[in-house]
């Protein structure tokens, strides 16, 4: 069921995704950077990836253990929901809501609400719904209700969706992000596409580098990871806004 580092009561950032390796591809740099700043980070993988074309669920589990060490997360959980058959039901919402209550994250990172892979689309809405359900005291009343403050959608490789609300500068941790992705050799070695990564004819690792460089260029840095939030962002002092117009 994935690598369990320790039991805990609160995390700052919880990344939730459909498959092992999704987090590494879309927001791995942000998790690494956050952990280095002293933030408590964790991951929930909704499925074990048992129907994937390459590798096996067992092998991907071992690969995720190695990647988790690089990401610096303090806990990684696998819910064991059906791969390629993920559903958003009262039962799956309650199961995920229980983990959200246990981990008590301030911020949750989810996939985009639109995507190429059916599991990713279902996962995005399932995560939003489970975060809401986690705050309803009468659902699984034996566990204290809790609701995260913020949901962010990781937008990497989804340029056909919406413009990012913001981009995290991952220039100083990009090589570590790439090493975490490379832990999934069964999925990515000699691959040219995966999940939301469209094929360009280049090796997948090169596509990740080029895409990260593109997002970094939007904020005038070397590498970046894009995010979208349904809420308008607050600014207290416009004189401190970064990213020059010229």
PLM features per residue range, with description:
Residues 1-103, 240-243:
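Active-site rim/loop-helix segments in enzyme catalytic domains that contact anionic ligands
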Residues 2-14, 90-246:
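Metal-dependent de-N-acetylase/amidase catalytic core
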């Amino acid at each position: 069921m994935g690598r369990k580092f320790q039991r805990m009561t609160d995390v700052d950032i919880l990344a939730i995704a459909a498959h092992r390796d999704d987090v590494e591809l879309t927001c791995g740099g942000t998790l690494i950077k956050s952990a280095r700043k002293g933030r408590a980070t964790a991951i929930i993988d909704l499925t074990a990836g048992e129907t994937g074309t390459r590798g096996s669920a067992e092998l991907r589990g071992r690969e995720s253990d190695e990647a988790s060490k690089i990401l610096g997360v303090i806990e990684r959980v696998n819910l064991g929901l059906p791969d390629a058959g993920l559903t958003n039901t009262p039962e799956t919402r309650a199961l995920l809501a229980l983990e959200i209550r246990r981990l008590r994250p301030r911020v949750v990172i989810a996939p985009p609400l639109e995507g190429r892979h059916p599991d990713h689309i279902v996962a995005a809405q399932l995560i939003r719904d489970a975060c809401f359900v986690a705050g309803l005291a009468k659902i699984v009343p034996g566990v204290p209700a809790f609701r995260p403050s913020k949901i962010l959608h990781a937008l990497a490789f989804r340029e056909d969706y919406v413009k990012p609300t913001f981009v995290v500068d991952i220039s100083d941790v990009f090589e570590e992000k790439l090493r975490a992705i490379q832990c999934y050799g069964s999925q990515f070695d000699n691959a040219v596409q995966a999940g939301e990564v469209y094929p360009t004819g280049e090796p997948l690792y090169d596509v990740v580098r080029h895409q990260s460089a593109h997002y970094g260029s939007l904020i005038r840095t070397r590498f970046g990871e894009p995010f979208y939030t349904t809420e308008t962002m607050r600014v207290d002092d416009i004189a401190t806004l970064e990213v020059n117009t010229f």
